[in-house]
């Protein structure tokens, strides 16, 4: 299976559930190195290759922009430039880009190649990268012949050191691969998702509770909801209560059997989907309770919890309990308060 813009947690869910993943297409460039941390560690461990796009940051990592004034919005005349200008702003601004371009120019002159060649060679040299995807506008610009030059030279230690020094003040983009499409700030051409979709449907359908004017609930379709007579989540006024949730797909498929952090990822996805379906958001969650089959899994599951909630920091309690049913290793419940 080939993936696009998967973050590390969700790539691992697929692997731990038994799917044969061979590649993940993600942004990798001198400006965006999110894929070079945990993602690289895991894909190297599992024989997966990264297909890198955004390598030239919409053309900003080329000679064209060296020593040029920062462009205004009217000069960003295509979707790609509009998108990657936001990457530049988030990573430290126009002057930091110029510092990188000057270093790339110095390296390019040493090897008698283009700045784009150097920027691309740097990405190809990353151990997890199997290929780069370089865009072309057939009616405007294409650089197929120049791109072949990438294979005519290598970056030596002096080159790599100079490039690394130029990136010393670059701010790391928040989050993981693909988060620019999932969480604000959206690093897209428009700064939101409006040019990708009109609206995002809820995962679960809210259902009014008969006889209760201020109460709605959602169901995720597990067999336990039917057996036990409970909803996945219920909203009363501005309060949303999410039932203890396990890594169950559909009626009874256990996700990531035997893997606690993988189960935690799937569970928190379901909790987030439940809260959003009832009009809330992840940032509205004020309390979570985590139940573990084994205390040894506490740190791994807590790291997943921390990556999900970040600065939200809900109140939390984590317990080791005597037993969970079947092969579940984690169960999580949550409470949210929707303001406004």
Stretch-by-stretch model annotation:
Residues 1, 24, 43, 53, ...:
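Conserved, mostly hydrophobic/aromatic
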Residues 1-34, 49:
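Glycine/proline-rich, positively charged
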Residues 3-9, 27-29, 55-58, 137, ...:
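Active-site beta-loop-alpha junctions enriched in small/polar residues
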Residues 35-79, 114:
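Aromatic-lined glycan-binding groove of carbohydrate-active enzymes
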Residues 58, 73-74, 188-269, 273-286, ...:
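N-terminal presequence-like segments and the immediate start of the first folded domain
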Residues 105-121:
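Acyl activation and transfer enzymes in specialized metabolism, enriched
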């Amino acid at each position: 299976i080939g993936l696009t813009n998967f973050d590390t947690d969700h790539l691992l869910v697929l692997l731990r559930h038994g799917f044969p993943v061979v590649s993940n297409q993600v942004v990798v460039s001198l400006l965006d190195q999110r894929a070079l941390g945990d993602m690289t560690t895991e894909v190297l461990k599992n024989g997966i290759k990264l297909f890198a796009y955004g390598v030239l940051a919409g053309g900003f990592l080329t000679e064209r922009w060296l020593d040029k004034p920062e462009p205004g919005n009217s000069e960003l005349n295509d979707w790609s430039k509009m998108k990657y200008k936001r990457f530049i702003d988030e990573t430290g601004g126009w002057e930091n880009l110029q510092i990188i371009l000057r270093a790339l120019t110095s390296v390019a002159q040493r090897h008698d190649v283009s700045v784009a060649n150097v920027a691309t060679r740097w990405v190809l040299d990353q151990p997890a990268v199997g290929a780069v995807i370089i865009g072309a506008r057939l009616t405007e610009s294409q650089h197929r012949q120049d791109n072949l030059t990438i294979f005519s030279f290598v970056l030596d230690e002096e080159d790599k050191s100079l490039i690394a020094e130029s990136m010393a003040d670059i701010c790391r983009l928040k989050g993981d691969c693909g988060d620019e499409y999932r969480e604000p700030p959206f690093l897209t051409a428009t700064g939101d998702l409006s040019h990708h979709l009109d609206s995002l449907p809820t995962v679960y359908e809210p259902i009014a509770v008969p006889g209760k004017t201020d109460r709605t609930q959602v169901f995720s379709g597990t067999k336990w909801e039917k057996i036990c007579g409970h909803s996945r989540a219920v909203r009363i006024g501005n309060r949303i209560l999410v039932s203890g949730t396990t890594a169950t797909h559909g009626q009874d498929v256990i996700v990531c059997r035997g893997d606690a952090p993988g189960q935690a990822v799937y569970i928190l996805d379901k909790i987030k989907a439940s809260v959003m379906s009832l009009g809330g958001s992840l940032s509205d969650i004020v309390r979570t309770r985590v139940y573990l089959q084994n205390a040894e899994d506490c740190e791994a599951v807590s790291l997943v919890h921390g990556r999900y909630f970040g600065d939200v920091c809900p109140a939390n309690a984590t317990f080791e309990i005597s037993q969970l049913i079947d092969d579940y290793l984690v169960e999580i419940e949550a409470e949210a308060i929707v303001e406004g």
